[in-house]
């Protein structure tokens, strides 16, 4: 063996050892690295074997499925009737097109790749005989007792004339916890004295391996069937036909599966779900594409670990590791001081991030992160990235503990909790703390308040730091002369620039706005758009609100004692009242005419709107629902009364169909608004 070959073999051995180690940790619920890091290791090993076929051996990690059942497992081993294969992955559009090019088909199925735990079910004459984990694809753990308490898994299949129950049926599926149920599952676990789960997949995997059936019942496990193994007395012509049969027998199938004939439509589906992955009822990490025709599947065959007739397109990771360089704090508009992580830039969920929230000092301690740690971060959609925790195994002793500041980093005021048991520490200098002032300005300029387009984060900070504004009370008195001292709103020649002129124009227009938006803009703690709408709708003026007794305020629908008390407390402060007085003097809306109140046609109804409507903007459709007594919700559940479906509707429409909810088009929605009934 030459020195070069020896080095290649050492490289292969090192990679193979890492892949085996991390795969075992993953399948036995002790992952040390995110899925994306494992995928990268696996792909590196695959590429090495493709470039140097002589390195591949029969037991290479690229040739095997899953991981052997752990020796310490408390469950019995059970052999699958037919091998339970994995899936090969592609990670970009070109790789997908290459696969489609060498795997032509009359029809493909696209299915969401559920981020859960694989399960194998065996039915004999319709009766559930056993359930098992994937294991190494040949042998898994017998988890029949746990599977029997999952409501989605029928104990007895129900045959029909079209689909008689076969003598033997082996089902492949995925067990998961819905995104909606996960917070409650975690809350229950904490109440029981346990540590919270990091994510729904870990929760599902841990739950299936519980020995205590009562604990399994608490976890709200769900299951979706996504394939068949060995069968006797059942020979469907296509995957689609198989799913129809499974559904007829009472087995759950995915509401998101779609049939497509054009490869270009497959690419479009991948793109669609990249943007809508958080619309699904479960977590997903990719889209699975399958050749639908089963005869074609047999002709294409499989490798030792995966079928050639299916592929998984993996989306950019939402959990990755990076280095925690520092922990700093930011000051919010209500004085709350929030620690955040400063990290080495890393690509996560399709964007590069270098900062992530740590919520409060209690969370920093609970998560056990040290400055210098390698940490796992998560970013879901547009959500701010969050540090999940440290990779303790990678510590080298140079890490150091974070010490939470005792003084405000913006103004030097001593920090303190608002009350003894408050986990959040606050800067009490609300009147003149630059950090609070600039964030309050940014907030009141937002779409949910005055909607001042030309006043962004940099502009707000500039107005405060330069002393142009001492607080928000003088905002509507700004003039061109005032802006000449600005660094953001002036040209290099020292004149007011286009942004400055736009700001002054925005300010004039925003004075005449809805009263509820003015209430939101005041940054009264706990008073958000919902409470502000309710208060403005009942009292119609700031003065009437000030004069209203506390008990009366608290009885306002959607307000309650805490919000009412917060409102009263805010107006006890002289400089707060000065803000209102100066805004009023500048012509800002302080009362609104009591016009004809819209008929409460939607009273008590919860309505979800998905997709675009021709006659409404996003804000106006919400206003139309709320002003008629309805609740405009952003998520579909069993409690939803109507789902309004417009152009380019997301998977909320699919979920509504799955739940059997009433679905309306725009015309039906307008009828509902006007008459209280969607019927023609």
Swiss-Prot record:
Catalytic activity: NAD(+) + (deoxyribonucleotide)n-3'-hydroxyl + 5'-phospho-(deoxyribonucleotide)m = (deoxyribonucleotide)n+m + AMP + beta-nicotinamide D-nucleotide
Residue positions of the active site: 113 (n6-amp-lysine intermediate)
Sequence positions that bind NAD(+): 35-39, 86-87, 111, 134, 174, 290, 314
EC number: 6.5.1.2
Cofactor requirement: Mg(2+); Mn(2+)
Keyword Transport among UniProt keywords: no
Gene3D superfamilies with a match to the protein in the record: 5' to 3' exonuclease, C-terminal subdomain (1.10.150.20), 6.20.10.30, BRCT domain (3.40.50.10190), DNA ligase/mRNA capping enzyme (3.30.470.30), Helix hairpin bin (1.10.287.610), Nucleic acid-binding proteins (2.40.50.140)
Domain BRCT: 597-680
Enzyme class: ligase
SMART domains the UniProt entry points to: BRCT, LIGANc
Molecular-function GO terms, alphabetical: DNA ligase (NAD+) activity; metal ion binding
Pfam families associated with the record: BRCT, DNA_ligase_aden, DNA_ligase_OB, DNA_ligase_ZBD, HHH_2
Coiled-coil features, chain-numbered ranges: none
Residues the record lists as binding Zn(2+): 408, 411, 427, 433
Keywords assigned by UniProt, alphabetized: DNA damage, DNA repair, DNA replication, Ligase, Magnesium, Manganese, Metal-binding, NAD, Zinc
Highest taxon, organism lineage: Bacteria
Annotated Gene Ontology cellular component terms: cytosol
GO biological process, one term: DNA replication
Family according to the record: Belongs to the NAD-dependent DNA ligase family. LigA subfamily.
NCBIfam families in the record: dnlj, PRK07956.1
Job of this protein: DNA ligase that catalyzes the formation of phosphodiester linkages between 5'-phosphoryl and 3'-hydroxyl groups in double-stranded DNA using NAD as a coenzyme and as the energy source for the reaction. It is essential for DNA replication and repair of damaged DNA.
Name the record gives this protein: DNA ligase
Organism: Corynebacterium glutamicum (strain R)
Lineage of producing organism: Bacteria, Bacillati, Actinomycetota, Actinomycetes, Mycobacteriales
Gene: ligA
């Amino acid at each position: 063996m030459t020195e070069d070959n020896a080095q290649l073999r050492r490289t292969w051995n090192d990679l193979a050892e890492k892949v085996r180690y991390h795969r075992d940790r993953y399948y036995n619920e002790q992952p040390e690295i995110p899925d994306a890091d494992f995928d990268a290791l696996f792909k590196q090993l695959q590429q090495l074997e493709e470039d140097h076929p002589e390195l591949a051996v029969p037991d290479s990690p690229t040739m095997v499925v899953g991981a052997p059942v752990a020796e310490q497992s408390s469950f019995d081993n059970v052999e699958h009737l037919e091998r339970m294969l994995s899936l090969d992955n592609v990670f970009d559009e070109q790789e997908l097109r290459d696969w489609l090019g060498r795997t032509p088909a009359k029809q493909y199925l696209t299915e969401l790749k559920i981020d859960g735990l694989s399960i194998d079910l065996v039915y004999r004459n319709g009766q559930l005989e056993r359930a098992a984990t994937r294991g190494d694809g040949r042998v898994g753990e017998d988890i029949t007792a746990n599977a029997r308490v999952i409501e989605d898994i029928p104990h007895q299949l129900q045959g029909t004339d079209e689909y008689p129950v076969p003598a033997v049926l082996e089902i492949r599926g995925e067990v998961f916890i819905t995104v909606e149920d996960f917070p409650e599952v975690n809350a229950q676990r904490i109440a029981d004295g346990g540590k919270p789960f990091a994510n729904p997949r870990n929760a599902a995997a841990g739950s299936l391996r519980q020995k205590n059936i009562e604990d399994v019942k608490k976890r709200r496990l769900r299951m979706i069937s996504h394939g068949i193994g060995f069968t006797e007395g059942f020979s469907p012509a296509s995957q689609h036909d198989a799913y129809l049969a499974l559904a007829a027998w009472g087995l759950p199938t995915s509401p998101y599966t779609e049939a497509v004939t054009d490869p270009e439509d497959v690419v479009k589906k991948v793109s669609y779900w990249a943007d809508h992955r958080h619309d699904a009822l479960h977590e997903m990490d990719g889209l699975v594409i399958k050749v639908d025709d089963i005869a074609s599947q047999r002709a294409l065959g499989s490798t030792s670990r995966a079928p050639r007739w299916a592929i998984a397109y993996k989306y950019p990771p939402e959990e990755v590791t990076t280095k925690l360089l520092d922990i700093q704090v930011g000051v919010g508009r209500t004085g709350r001081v929030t620690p955040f992580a400063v990290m080495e830039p890393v690509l996560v969920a399709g964007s590069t991030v270098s900062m992530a929230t740590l919520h409060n000092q209690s969370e920093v301690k609970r998560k056990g992160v040290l400055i210098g740690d390698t940490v796992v971060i998560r970013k879901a959609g547009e959500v701010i990235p969050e540090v999940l925790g440290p990779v303790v195994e990678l510590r080298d002793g140079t890490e150091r503990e974070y010490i939470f500041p005792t003084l405000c980093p913006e103004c030097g005021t001593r920090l303190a909790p608002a009350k003894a048991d408050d986990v959040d520490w606050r800067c009490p200098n609300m009147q003149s703390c630059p950090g609070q002032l600039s964030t309050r300005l940014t907030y009141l300029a937002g779409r949910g308040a005055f909607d001042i387009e030309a006043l962004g984060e940099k502009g707000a900070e500039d107005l405060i730091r330069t002393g142009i504004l001492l607080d928000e009370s003088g905002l509507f008195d700004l003039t061109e002369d005032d802006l000449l001292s600005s660094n953001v709103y002036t040209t290099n020649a020292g004149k007011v620039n286009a942004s400055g002129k736009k700001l002054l124009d925005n300010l004039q227009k925003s004075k005449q706005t809805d009263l509820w938006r003015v209430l939101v803009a005041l940054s009264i703690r706990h008073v958000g758009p919902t409470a502000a709408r309710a208060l403005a709708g009942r009292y119609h003026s700031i003065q009437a609100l000030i004069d209203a007794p506390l008990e009366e305020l608290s009885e306002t629908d959607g307000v309650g004692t805490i919000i009412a008390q917060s409102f009263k407390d805010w107006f006890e402060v002289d400089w707060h009242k000065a803000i209102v007085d100066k805004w009023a003097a500048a012509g800002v809306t302080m009362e609104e005419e009591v016009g004809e109140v819209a008929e409460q046609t939607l009273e008590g109804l919860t309505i979800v709107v998905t997709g675009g409507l021709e006659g409404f903007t996003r804000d106006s459709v919400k206003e139309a629902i709320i002003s008629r007594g309805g609740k405009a919700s952003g998520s579909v559940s069993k409690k939803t009364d109507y789902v309004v479906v417009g152009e380019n509707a997301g998977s909320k429409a699919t979920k509504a169909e799955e739940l059997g909810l009433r679905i309306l088009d725009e015309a039906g929605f307008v009828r509902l608004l006007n008459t209280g009934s969607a019927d023609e």
